[in-house]
């Protein structure tokens, strides 16, 4: 990773105009109250406004209601007093504080974020902290301390305070255990990311080094053997990718109904996942159809790992032949930014669909241009449908600290789900966490510029991007089938499926994890 990139990044963060920064942070939570030690009031979440701008992404708006606060929430206020002692209880506006410096804005952002996160957790019915035993109270306190250390360290890193960040990292490393609680484990991954980011911080004026970038479509293109093994385990044990495959195939089968010549363009070939699981399922479903015979199925794989994709193609060809399906498999060795319509051979008789599983977010850059060009190129192919699955979280915000805390919330939910699925000392879980999810986290936390590929965004943001490229959303009406799929595949209790504005969203205890959407030209 280029030190120059970090010099530029941190210069932008530190040199922001304070008054503008104050306006930005105040706009994040315009109605956010002070946490009170009250037993009769709390705060509940409202849906996101459709009128939020792109720069200010997916932040929570709050409104007041009269309910009972759990005991642990009152304890949170006392344990976290240090995070809120700088807030004036008579005035919540950041702009009213005169001449704030950058660190003051960081601190205010942190305070407001913790307030919203605390009340969101307080509103969840899944946790009954009123019945916590003494030892559980102790673990809650330890977890709270770990959260405080993580955010304080992220603040120090954002402010280029290397000495303070190093002290905090030393304490974090002794408390964030790979085989500890779910939050200790996810904290260990964020500690790795913060450590890497800290080592890349250079003086603001140092622009001597350039970035040594390698052409990649996603982080799996440069995966180690350990990461590839971990990715297979993620596919087998977590429902995230399988859910995307199931919903996508259901949409594709509907688009292929009554057609004889079929063509699928797969962007990224499911990150190079071995054996082509998604297309085996599609081929089997097409072979099982008795109403209409498929005369030809074409699959065009877009990717850079040619050897890996060729193996998948050979296996799929044999599989399809055994089921009586004529399959033509081809590869386009390009990344999505360089892909042109002429690279994909489309026959007039064919029904074309485009499939993207956890791929398009890798094309999102600081500017809109790269992704918009890719989407317009796809639109020019006139596919019957474009189906995409993406992580449903805002990890591409303009400020490091906000991005850090959004990803901390998201991956905490994933690690909590792993906690429910696998035993504490299970080596498979450790491999998934430390060799796959940790790599995603480190990419979000430590990388900038073209090396930051895990730029996950919320459904609303994708809706705006797709609309600008000329696509129209096609609602997915299969919540019942998706829930039946969860039961059929023995997916761990705690996973939820909801329809949200035409998309199908898989979540963990209502926290969105993956969203699948369908688009037409």
UniProtKB/Swiss-Prot annotation:
UniProt motif (VHIID) ranges: 262-266
Protein name as annotated: GRAS family protein RAD1
Domain of life: Eukaryota
Name of the gene: RAD1
Region named Leucine repeat I (LRI): 144-212
GO cellular component, one term: nucleus
Subcellular location, record wording: Nucleus
Region SAW, annotated ranges: 446-520
Domain GRAS span(s) in chain numbering: 137-520
Keyword terms, alphabetized: Nucleus, Transcription, Transcription regulation
UniProt record similarity statement: Belongs to the GRAS family.
Effect of deleting the gene: Reduced intraradical colonization by arbuscular mycorrhiza (AM)-fungi (e.g. Glomus versiforme) upon symbiosis in roots.
Region (PFYRE): 352-443
Induction / repression: Accumulates in roots, in a RAM1-dependent manner, during colonization by arbuscular mycorrhizal fungi (e.g. Glomus versiforme). Triggered by RAM1.
Record text on subunit structure and interactions: Interacts with RAM1. Interacts with NSP2.
Major location (coarse): nucleus
BP terms from Gene Ontology: regulation of DNA-templated transcription; response to symbiotic fungus
Any one Gene Ontology molecular-function term assigned to this protein's record: sequence-specific DNA binding
Residue ranges of the region described as Leucine repeat II (LRII): 311-343
Region (VHIID): 231-301
Gene source species: Medicago truncatula
């Amino acid at each position: 990773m280029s030190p120059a990139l970090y010099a530029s990044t941190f210069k932008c963060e530190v040199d922001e105009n304070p008054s503008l920064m104050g306006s930005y942070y105040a706009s994040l939570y315009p109605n956010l109250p002070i946490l009170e030690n009250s037993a009769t009031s709390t705060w509940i979440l409202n849906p996101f406004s459709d009128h939020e701008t792109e720069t200010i992404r997916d932040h929570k708006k709050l409104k007041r209601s009269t309910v009972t606060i759990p005991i642990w929430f009152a304890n949170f206020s006392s344990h976290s007093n240090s995070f809120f002692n700088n807030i004036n209880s008579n005035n919540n506006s950041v702009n009213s504080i005169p001449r704030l410096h950058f660190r003051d804005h960081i601190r205010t952002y942190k305070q407001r974020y913790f307030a919203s996160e605390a009340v969101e957790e307080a509103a969840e019915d899944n946790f009954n902290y009123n019945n916590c035993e003494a030892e559980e109270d102790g673990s809650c306190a330890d977890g709270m301390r770990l959260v405080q250390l993580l955010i304080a360290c992220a603040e120090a890193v954002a402010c280029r305070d290397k000495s303070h960040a190093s002290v905090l990292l030393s304490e974090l490393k002794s408390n964030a255990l790979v085989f500890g609680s779910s939050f200790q484990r996810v904290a260990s991954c964020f500690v790795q990311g913060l450590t890497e980011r800290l080592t890349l911080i250079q003086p603001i004026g140092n622009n001597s080094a350039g970035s040594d970038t390698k052409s990649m479509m996603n982080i799996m293109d440069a995966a180690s053997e350990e990461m590839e093994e971990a990715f297979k385990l993620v596919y087998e044990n977590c429902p995230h990718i399988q859910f995307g495959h199931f919903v996508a195939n259901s949409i594709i089968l509907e688009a292929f109904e009554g057609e004889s010549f079929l063509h699928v363009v797969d962007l990224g070939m499911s990150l190079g996942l071995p054996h082509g699981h998604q297309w085996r399922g599609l081929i089997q479903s097409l072979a099982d159809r008795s109403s209409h015979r498929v005369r030809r199925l074409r699959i065009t794989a877009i990717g850079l790992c040619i050897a890996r994709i060729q193996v998948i193609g050979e296996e799929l060809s044999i599989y399809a032949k055994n089921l009586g399906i004529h399959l033509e498999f081809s590869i386009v060795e390009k990344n999505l930014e360089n892909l042109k319509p002429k690279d994909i051979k489309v026959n007039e008789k064919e029904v074309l669909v485009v499939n993207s599983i956890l791929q398009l977010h890798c094309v999102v850059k600081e500017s809109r241009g790269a992704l918009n060009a890719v989407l317009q190129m796809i639109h020019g192919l006139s596919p019957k449908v474009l189906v995409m699955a993406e992580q449903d979280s805002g990890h591409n915000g303009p400020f490091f600290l906000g991005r850090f805390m959004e990803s901390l919330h998201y991956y905490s939910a994933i690690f909590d789900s792993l906690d429910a699925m696998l035993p504490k000392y299970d080596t498979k879980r450790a491999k998934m966490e430390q060799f796959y999810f940790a790599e995603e986290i480190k990419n979000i936390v430590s990388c900038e510029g073209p090396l930051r590929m895990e730029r996950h965004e919320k459904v609303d943001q994708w809706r705006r991007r797709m609309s600008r490229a000329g696509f129209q959303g096609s609602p997915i009406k299969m919540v019942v089938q998706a829930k039946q799929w969860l039961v059929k595949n023995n997916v761990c209790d705690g996973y939820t499926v909801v329809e949200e504005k035409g998309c199908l969203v898989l979540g963990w205890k209502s926290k969105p994890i993956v969203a699948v959407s369908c688009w037409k030209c």
